[in-house]
């Protein structure tokens, strides 16, 4: 009987504590938490803006395993939003009109010991407009970063930095308005893929001190200016730069040490600066064990290119030119400029043959248009045509003159001999005088 008051008192304390408990994001009108402790937010017309915070009222609950946001007009991540969410594995953002990712808001490494065996975070952004990804916004233990079909207004320095255990970074069909230097800084990933979309300028050190252990790929991207030292990358097994449209490719734009072959294929480039391929090298250990690696330049169309633009690292690489289309009109002078490259490297280099309206290999053009006689061939043709025209004009002149002389001769019509057998004709030429009024 004495214990009854204590149980009543304890129940009252628990009830009061429950009443005083602050609401979490699960209690937000636009959000809910499911049985898997995932925070799922789908904004409506009444609740268009959402702010995710680490503490205080409507904070993300510490048991959250995923944060899934869809259809909001505006989403803001405050600093340290996910830092202490030890159970978190996924951050997914879809169809959001304005996203702001503040400093350290997606910095996540809740484990006391830094180890790649610890589970990591997966970050997905799809079909959204990201106003800004601040410096140091994404750090720590991250498995994958996938951003697709989105627009990024501002990407600050060190936005993605000091990451561990990264498997894949994939940027697909995005529009980058303003990228600042060293946006991706100092981490290791298995794969880095930049595919589709467009960027006004990829600045120097866009990727800085990044180690890619498997695949480095840039494919189908429209780039106005790819600056010098844009990609500072080490040790990928495979490098593929394919089907891109680049206005200007600066020298040493790809500063990459590879452990395997390098392919630069099906790209359209307006201007290639000197030394554009000089930054490609092969790792010293790989060269010592397997020999020089291949640098394949295959089926590219380039408007402004000089032989010095194809300078490469001969110590660690072997260059293979297979279908380089120079978007320039074929001339014997152009062919002479590339004669040395062809004799040294071999391969197929084409120029635009206007007379026939297609690309033709430089050796073929040399053989057909640039011999000792062929250089003066058109001069002979022009002179021959001129001589023929003059001869024709002279011939026409004499023919017309002869015809005119025939017309001036007197013509007499003789009567039939049967009728006028004894008729004599006397032709008297009289001088005609002017008539006077005396007649």
Model segments located where?
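Extracellular leucine-rich repeat
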Residues: 2-439
């Amino acid at each position: 009987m004495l214990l009854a008051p204590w149980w009543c008192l304890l129940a009252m304390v628990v009830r009061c504590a429950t009443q005083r408990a602050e609401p979490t994001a699960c209690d937000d009108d636009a959000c809910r938490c499911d049985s898997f402790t995932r925070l799922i937010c789908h904004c409506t017309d009444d609740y268009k803006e959402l702010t995710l915070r680490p503490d205080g009222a409507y904070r993300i609950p510490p048991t959250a395993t995923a944060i899934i946001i869809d259809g909001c007009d505006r989403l803001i991540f405050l600093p340290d939003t996910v830092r202490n969410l030890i159970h978190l594995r996924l951050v997914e953002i879809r169809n959001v009109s304005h996203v702001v990712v503040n400093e350290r808001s997606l910095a996540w490494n809740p484990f006391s010991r830094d180890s790649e065996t610890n589970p990591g975070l997966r970050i997905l952004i799809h079909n959204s407009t990201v106003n800004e990804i601040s410096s140091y916004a994404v750090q720590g233990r991250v498995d994958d970063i996938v951003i697709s079909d989105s627009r990024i207004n501002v990407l600050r320095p060190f936005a993605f930095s000091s990451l561990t255990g990264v498997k894949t970074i994939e940027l697909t069909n995005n529009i980058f308005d303003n990228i600042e230097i060293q946006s991706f800084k100092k981490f290791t990933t298995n794969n880095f893929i930049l595919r589709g979309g467009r960027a006004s300028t990829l600045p120097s050190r866009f990727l800085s001190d990044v180690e890619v252990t498997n695949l480095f790929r840039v494919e189908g991207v429209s780039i106005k200016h790819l600056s010098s030292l844009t990609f500072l990358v080490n040790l990928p097994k495979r490098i593929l730069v394919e089907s891109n449209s680049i206005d200007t490719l600066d020298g040493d734009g790809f500063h990459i040490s590879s452990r395997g072959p390098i392919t630069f294929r099906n790209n359209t480039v307006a201007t290639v600066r000197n030394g554009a391929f000089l930054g490609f090298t092969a790792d010293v250990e790989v060269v010592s064990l397997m020999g020089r690696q291949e640098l394949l330049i295959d089926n590219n169309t380039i408007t402004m290119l000089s032989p010095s633009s194809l300078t490469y690292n001969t110590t660690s690489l072997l260059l293979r030119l297979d279908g380089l289309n120079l978007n320039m009109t074929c001339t014997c002078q152009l062919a002479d400029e590339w004669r040395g490259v062809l004799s040294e490297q071999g391969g197929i280099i084409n120029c635009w043959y206007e007379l026939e309206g297609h690309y033709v290999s430089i050796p073929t053009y040399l053989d057909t248009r640039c011999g000792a006689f062929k250089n003066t061939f058109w001069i002979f043709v022009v002179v021959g045509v001129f001589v023929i025209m003059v001869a024709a004009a002279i011939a026409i002149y004499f023919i017309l003159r002869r015809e005119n002389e025939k017309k001036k001769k007197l013509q007499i019509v003789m009567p039939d001999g049967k009728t006028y057998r004894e008729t004599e004709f006397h032709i008297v030429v009289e001088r005609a005088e002017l008539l006077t009024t005396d007649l």
